[in-house]
Amino acid sequence: MPPELLSPTLDVLRCLVEDYSVTVVLSTATQPTFEESRLLRELAGCEIREIVEGYAEHFRVLERVEYRVLPEPVSWQDLADEIRRRHQVMVILNTRRDALAVLDQFDEDEDIFHLSTLLCGAHRREILKTIHCRLKAGEPVRLVSTQVVEAGVDLDFPEVWRAIGPLDRIVQAAGRC
């Protein structure tokens, strides 16, 4: 919701609760905590209670991804070296050009996979099938990809590196971990 619409929307909700005895359920994947936000002030006088008791504990238990931002840019060669050091890793880059620049750092005989829209759908499916089998078998899998893997692709790597980009894309990449 655009920030400028929050106050008027909450005013309408408060009016519905106070004047018409309406019950309002706020539900979102990223709901802010009421204790730490202006929502508490905006909804003054309304009874606010969590439907799920101990929700913070649920988040802690389900926390499975660690985000790290590198303090300095990494060269393509340094990135390739990091990929080589890992048993199973996926690197997601923003452009096909960037993916190819990283791939250029590898010798032809090195075991590296590539996915992007430079490949036709049939070839991408074939590569994905091979990757799935190798991940399941615990074999080495090093994948350099574009954003093509961020939606509609079921991959589960122990480690994912993502080029800086919009937050929703970074979160999407974390879903591949």
Positions of predicted regions on the chain:
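Conserved strand-helix element at the start of the C-terminal RecA-like helicase core
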Residues: 82-107
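Conserved RecA-like helicase motor core of SF1/SF2 enzymes
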Residues: 112-125, 130-132, 140-177
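Short glycine-/polar-rich loops that comprise or flank the Walker A/P-loop
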Residues: 20-22, 61-65, 109-111, 155-159
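Interdomain hinge/linker at the junction between the two RecA-like core domains of SF2 helicases
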Residues: 15, 19, 30-85
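Generic beta-strand/beta-sheet core signal
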Residues: 1, 25-27, 92-94, 115, ...
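Short, conserved "post-DEAD/DEAH" coupling segment immediately C-terminal to helicase motif II
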Residues: 2-22
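Loop/turn-to-beta-strand initiation segments
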Residues: 19-25, 88, 139-142
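Conserved nucleotide-binding/hydrolysis micro-motifs of P-loop NTPases
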Residues: 24, 30-34, 71-75, 96-99, ...
